């Protein structure tokens, strides 16, 4: 089985930056995308954009050379989640995610759904604890563990289920790399260059701090999308990361 998207036209990037596209309008989103280079980043499409614009928007990004992280955080019964993950693979996305709290059977079903795609399968990662959540939020759900300990528990479960990695906060990256090894991918939202506002993220780091902590892919939104010169902002971030490497 192969994905329907044409992969040969996509740019190959070594950048760990994934730009979060948070637009409610296709034309505005593509106007931004056309100002940046697919060699400088990948793009993240989340629930709002995918609900509004559908799979064709992902194809539009592919046609412009970008690899896409489809951030839909699937969380359902195992069979439904597996079918959704397979549909994402058919679309040709680079990465797709599920909620680790969906449990072992759900995550295993999702992983097995990607086996027919072979080397063309997207990376499959799991969300541990949302970066907006604090200890008090978990306590409201009856979870007495700290965000870090709960995330570690879910990350260990994710690895046992054979997924490629997890979404986690940068603060947890050092611990996860030590406990789960370098091959286990860490994807971190809430990354903001020095001087950026925190917004609705609570556990944030700069790109340089995240890289030093062991983050493999860092999601950056408004500091790039709201920049007067997003291409220059991306280049500056990548240069700063290459100096730290």
Swiss-Prot record:
EC numbers for this chain: 4.1.1.23
Functional pathway: Pyrimidine metabolism; UMP biosynthesis via de novo pathway; UMP from orotate: step 2/2
GO molecular function: orotidine-5'-phosphate decarboxylase activity
InterPro entries: Aldolase_TIM, OMPdecase, OMPdecase_AS, OMPdecase_bac, OMPdeCOase_dom, RibuloseP-bd_barrel
Reactions that this protein is recorded to catalyse: orotidine 5'-phosphate + H(+) = UMP + CO2
Assigned GO CC terms: cytosol
Active site positions: 73
Positions that bind substrate: 22, 44, 71-80, 131, 192, 201, 221-222
Top EC group: lyase
SUPFAM superfamilies with a match to the protein in the record: Ribulose-phoshate binding barrel
Keywords: Decarboxylase, Lyase, Pyrimidine biosynthesis
Gene Ontology terms: biological process: 'de novo' pyrimidine nucleobase biosynthetic process; 'de novo' UMP biosynthetic process
SMART domains attached to this UniProt entry: OMPdecase
UniProt xrefs under Pfam families: OMPdecase (PF00215)
Subunit structure: Homodimer.
NCBIfam families noted in UniProt: PRK00230.1, pyrF
Its biological purpose: Catalyzes the decarboxylation of orotidine 5'-monophosphate (OMP) to uridine 5'-monophosphate (UMP).
Protein family (similarity comment): Belongs to the OMP decarboxylase family. Type 1 subfamily.
Protein name: Orotidine 5'-phosphate decarboxylase
Species name: Klebsiella pneumoniae (strain 342)
Annotated gene: pyrF
